[in-house]
């Protein structure tokens, strides 16, 4: 009878373990990707998955999105694993948030100096206040996961010199071998399958992928596309402001800004309030063009409405990105 019970437990073991849900974190870290990660973790928790490995290959991205992903990973009760192809900048914070880190051949982790990115301008290093705040976040995550705090901070602050690893003025970047040697990562693996086996995850893997809505949102909220839409939209509306009537410049400007806000809405960044502000700006634009040509009050009001809706949609963190300089 005892033997039968043992065999029954063995047969039920794969069911008890559940699936492993592989979540790819590829390309730029943006708000829509954060939505995808939250959805993936919610599904994994709902279906009692055996664990959630993240396949990370990113050059960086937005600070707010990276922190949002990091916080969600830290909150989940499920085992998490970072399988690192490249985890630069924002990717480093996400990798450090996982319970285990496995480095693939040729992978690197680090280089998390925050920069300020304005549309159509070269990124500039953030001020010391921002660096200090982000360094604190890296420190807190490293402490939570038992990683070397000093090395995590050195990934953010270029003024922290690590002898033999990084010179002063350069944020820390570690190769796969160095990351394992210094306990930033747990081990190296030759492939994703080997990484999953070594970390003790179920061999039954389902790779999750973002749906069409998230894919469109990722495209529209990427730093390049969102920056172009915002810059061109505001520029064309500025031209329309000094042009009698309502013409092509105004129509194109509104179209670009509509796409800009659509990306924020799809990514869950904007709601009814921001939409109402934008619609108010459109109403003022049409009122000035059709009813009160040349009225400066309407023009100033619509400009204020547009700028306010931009701010409330993306916030001040929209200017902060974590990327390889």
Where are these regions (language model features)?
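Hydrophobic, low-charge alpha-helical segments
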Residues: 258-325
